[in-house]
Amino acid sequence: MMASSDSAAPLPPAALAAFLRGCERRGAVFAELQCGDTDRGDVALAAALRAFRGNAAALPMADWPVRFWSLLAATPQLRADGAHAHWSGSLAALAAPAPADRAALLLRLAGGLQEAEAAEALGIDGPAYRDALARACPRDATGQPDAAGWRALAEAIQQHLR
């Protein structure tokens, strides 16, 4: 009996479906909060899901998370604020950062990615990612990073995920 060593064998559709189920809600929240518009975020998510489904089988499963998030972050709808962008209440701090910096923050807080994965998804190195994250961090009245503001924003995003 010969064991198959073909690593290019097609992945079972169940593996792809399970992966997408696991990241779809986080992706929807990331997209909405990145552009400040639910409808625009839904369009971006749908485009990223289509693109991901089209090439996932050619990738090792270990590469799927970074590939999915990089496709989503690169959609045109999420690279600039739309005309109807709005962040209110406990999410109002998301209006201040530039879109690229906001993406760094949201990959961490909504996407749940670690630093290295988030940097790779954005196509930047670790120091550039940390700089973007620092720029996106809520600030206090003196312009210093606001730890309480960061915690409040992180909690608001977690509530939004639920």
Functional labels for PLM-detected ranges:
Residues 2-29, 39, 102:
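A short, charge-rich alpha-helical start-of-domain segment used by transcription regulators
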Residues 96-121:
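Short amphipathic alpha helix immediately N-terminal
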Residues 37, 114, 124-128:
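Helix-turn-helix DNA-binding motif, specifically the short coil turn and the N-cap/start of the second
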Residues 122-158:
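DNA-recognition helix of helix-turn-helix
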Residues 88-98, 120, 125, 140:
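Short amphipathic alpha-helical boundary/capping segments
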Residues 1-7, 155-162:
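Extreme N-terminal regulatory/targeting segments of RNA polymerase sigma factors
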Residues 24-32, 42-83, 90-91, 133:
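Σ70-family region 2.3-2.4 aromatic/basic alpha-helix that recognizes the −10 promoter
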